[in-house]
């Protein structure tokens, strides 16, 4: 019950928002990581409406990820972070800040970066 778990991709197969919401309710220490997340964004790179609602309501439970699991993926890191900045901009500023860095800092016991 005290274990903290980071759920890679918040479901790599594109788990429906309802499923993600149910698992967050069932497991209070579950954190959703948001790299390679089908359905997260709309066609223009902004957040889909259902994910915007979920991330706004549960911003303390998600964190940005990059999915740089092999060295070759680091070549596209800047682009990945630019994509994340694009959809983070669709959230209220406090929620975006939590997802972008505060939740990760808290999870790993690091000081919260100054704004």
Indicate residue ranges for each PLM-predicted region:
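Residue-level detector of flexible, active-site-proximal loop/helix-junction positions
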Residues: 12, 38, 69, 103-106
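Alpha-helix capping and helix-coil boundary motifs
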Residues: 43-47, 69, 76
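Conserved, mostly hydrophobic/aromatic
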Residues: 9, 32, 67, 96, ...
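Catalytic pocket-lining loop regions of alpha/beta-barrel enzymes
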Residues: 1-64, 114
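Mid-to-C-terminal alpha-helical segments outside catalytic/metal-binding sites
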Residues: 60-61, 71-115
